[in-house]
């Protein structure tokens, strides 16, 4: 790869600009990019791509769809992924094509006001407020059962107002190419989407915590319209300016219309099948005449649902149905008539990946191969089903988001005279839009709102008003549901406080009932549900070594248990050989077992997913003959003030405040 030639091109192209622009960030960036310009390998065939203002280099890591291929694919395979000589190129004359480039530029278009026509003085003030965490808020509960919190950087300008609902695309500044497909597919924006769409299309950050299986498809389509609209407008602007530069070569033009690298949209998704659904939505609205590598994409990403899962919950089938592999990455490139799958990242417009799949190429063992420059110019981030990503490995999500919009280490064929000023000033993270959808909001997901959502245009958080999972228990008889609050000074001390309360208060009475019972059949059947794996290990070790539990037979299964081990433990528990069964939330998330033999339930902590409450409590009714006795055994759950978010989902929005603040007692019972 001829890095020196590219660097010479970049530096020579930017000499004239440097004489005119002496901004410190620009000079520092040029100095930074002069480092490490030695060739790292043999020169390869390169092709002209009139998109980012110059010649673009090949990207070393493959953006392929196969986990095995990702590890084995060499330079030749990467070269083969490049467009063939016959493939349609990006030429300036495309600006006169059918991409809707005849659309008149509208000064009121959010694309213009957010990315191009920015008042730099106002932008600087808003960035300063965002950096100092000075936000002005407005809250509102709307009739559809949603709570909205909107925040904007506090620069002393008026009050914060909520945007009116959007019911049609008529008020959205869409490319003409998109208007027909969008209005045909979505004639009316309804449900939660009508309240969220105004913020999406006005380029504000969105944290949506009410994702369901019934509304996920509509939200996915709206996000696809937004993503494709952004790609087309970005691409059209660049091609128009390319044409203008070619026609006015003697003019001193200052056309800043792009970032450092080509990728503009990043999707983070939990599974390959989720990627297929997102791509299908994108294709539905872009409507390409040709789709290159589509068969390869479907063969490696899509699969049929498992017919044996017909009795599994609907949300489980949505998440794990089809191809549930969580190791993937995919680049999509758009030309006038074609959409190409498996394009190299530096030649892609949209990148879709799982957190694990993306991190494997960003954080390689060989330091020289580590690369995240392709994320330097991402302007739209879509994180779908964030709660599912939380159950995978949230550290990967944080790793990726921490490396978004950093200034690149290499030039990658960038024409710096075309780069927007706020990129050069290292302010891209304040202009980037982030949209996160989740079935529920946890502290980890909530931290995205405060840490990574720094949009100068503002941000909005949308959460449901919860009735409470305790009121939707699927049992034919009422069951006693008791919540015990324990004191915990800080989140870091919470695990120790919880363990102490469990072993001294809950376990002592539990052991006494088990060991003193004359009827062995009634002595067993205690399920201990533990949300955290670390807590699970601690409790399991205590049961195995403590003198307190010497006479208590128990089984313990987690997401790391082997299938044979899980089958044996479940059988022993059902038959009464194990009086106690320890069971983790992540195991339930991945398996959704129906545990038989449950007569009483102890929740070491309430589940993050409110659906799990009804499913776990429902175990009490799996044996119709003993359902009345099981209902008497009931449920006991431990909580502290640090469990506020998930406790609200279990007991309901109206009840949670009193339970956290009540000074008259620490035990609450619902029947």
Curated annotation (Swiss-Prot):
Primary subcellular site in the record, as a coarse category: nucleus
GO MF term list: rRNA binding; U3 snoRNA binding
InterPro entries from the UniProt entry: P-loop_NTPase (IPR027417), UTP25 (IPR010678), UTP25_C (IPR053939), UTP25_NTPase-like (IPR053940)
Leader sequence residues: none
Keywords: Nucleus, Ribonucleoprotein, Ribosome biogenesis, rRNA processing
GO CC term, one of those recorded: nucleolus
Originating species: Aspergillus fumigatus (strain ATCC MYA-4609 / CBS 101355 / FGSC A1100 / Af293) (Neosartorya fumigata)
Protein name (database record): U3 small nucleolar RNA-associated protein 25
Gene name for this UniProt entry: utp25
Function recorded in the entry: DEAD-box RNA helicase-like protein required for pre-18S rRNA processing, specifically at sites A0, A1, and A2.
Subunit relationships: Component of the ribosomal small subunit (SSU) processome composed of at least 40 protein subunits and snoRNA U3.
Biased composition (Basic and acidic residues): 49-59
GO biological process per UniProt: maturation of SSU-rRNA from tricistronic rRNA transcript (SSU-rRNA, 5.8S rRNA, LSU-rRNA)
Protein's cellular compartments: Nucleus, Nucleolus
Keyword Endoplasmic reticulum attributed: no
Pfam families for the chain: Utp25_C, UTP25_NTPase-like
Record's keyword annotation contains rRNA processing: yes
Biased composition (Acidic residues): 10-20, 66-93
Residue numbers spanned by region Disordered: 1-110
Gene3D superfamilies for this protein: P-loop containing nucleotide triphosphate hydrolases (3.40.50.300)
Disulfide bridge partners, by residue number: none
Family statement: Belongs to the UTP25 family.
